[in-house]
Regions:
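Start-transfer (signal-anchor) and selected internal transmembrane alpha helices
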Residues: 1-11
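Helix-to-loop transition at the C-terminal end of transmembrane segments
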Residues: 10-30, 121
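Short hydrophobic/aromatic helix or loop-helix immediately within or flanking a transmembrane segment
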Residues: 46-69
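Loop-to-helix entry region of an early transmembrane alpha helix in multi-pass inner-membrane enzymes
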Residues: 67-86
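Transmembrane-helix motifs of polytopic, lipid-linked glycan transferases
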Residues: 80-101, 139-144
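Transmembrane-helix signature of polytopic, membrane-embedded enzymes
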Residues: 94-117, 136
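Membrane-interface transmembrane helices that cradle and orient dolichyl/undecaprenyl
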Residues: 133, 138-156
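Membrane-interface alpha helices of multi-pass inner-membrane proteins
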Residues: 154-169, 174-181
Length: 186
């Protein structure tokens, strides 16, 4: 059961490397049009794009521009392995801790195959994976909270940093509208 999601991740990766395109999609052209693909200026990082703030994601995009020269194939390959691989690893880690029996954890983990369907976060825009990064950070924080193993100060510090990363990775207009609504009624 454990091997099925891992095989699906490998199949996604191979399919992306075989049939992926190295041309940026429409949303990815904005940085070229505005000539700020390499800008780490705070005003740019905290600028709303499509009614969404993504400062951490924009930093990752700039680093990818510098390291991969704007080629989406290696960028999306690394993001796929990092995000989907991270989600799988964290899910396995949490399931094996909560369920305590390897057979049950393996059976529950097998259902994570559905999150690995093609064209979920990869194959279109480079920046689409930004939406999944908060989940990776929050699952990592949950893992540190539940499993422990670290002394209190480094663990709490890491959880705080993961919370900040999750919060600054993808802030949609809907979240901002909700917060403003709560603040006005509160």
């Amino acid at each position: 059961c454990v091997i099925v999601p891992l095989l699906m991740l490998a199949a996604n990766l191979l399919a992306w490397l075989r049939w992926g395109t190295d041309l940026p999609m429409v949303d990815d052209w904005r940085v070229y049009d505005e000539r700020n693909a390499l800008s780490l200026a705070p005003a740019r990082l905290f600028e709303a794009i499509n009614n969404t703030l993504t400062p951490v994601g924009l930093v990752l995009d700039v680093l990818a521009q510098r390291w991969f020269g704007g080629n989406p194939l290696p960028y999306q390959t690394v993001s796929m392995l990092g995000v989907l691989g991270g989600l799988l690893w964290l899910q396995w880690r949490l399931l094996s801790w909560v369920l305590r029996r390897t057979e049950w954890a393996a059976l529950a983990f097998a259902f994570s195959v559905f999150m690995l369907q093609s064209d979920t976060y990869w194959g279109a825009q480079n920046l689409a994976y930004h939406q999944a990064l908060p989940l990776v950070a929050l699952l990592a924080a949950m893992s540190l909270t539940l499993r422990g193993g670290w002394p209190a100060f480094p663990r709490v510090s890491a959880i705080f940093v993961l919370g900040v990363v999750a919060g600054l990775t993808y802030i949609s207009g809907a979240v901002a509208a909700f917060v403003i609504g709560v603040a006005w009624t509160g």
